[in-house]
Amino acid sequence: FIPTTTETYTFYTNSDDASYLWIGGNALTGYTTSNALVNNGGIHGMVEVSGSIKLKANTYYPIRIQYGQGGGGLGLTINYSTPTISKNQLLPVVCKPHTGL
């Protein structure tokens, strides 16, 4: 992820079931559910959870997304926003298991 502005970015996962999002160094090594920027863990229907982090413009930040499906309904969307940028979809599709997306 390469931010276009230096400011606080809020990342959202909306998932059925669990999803986690890490950004920066934790996305590469040492990632655990307890240090995820967004921890949307558990067995549940579509639930949106968010986390915020200050990012510097034109700097590369690796992102790791982990998703788990327990049965029944399913889906995952990842979005971000800032105080000056409306909510945008980070992934261009709604991700579903067994579809390759």
PLM-predicted stretches and their roles:
Residues 1-101:
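Acidic/polar, compositionally biased interaction segments
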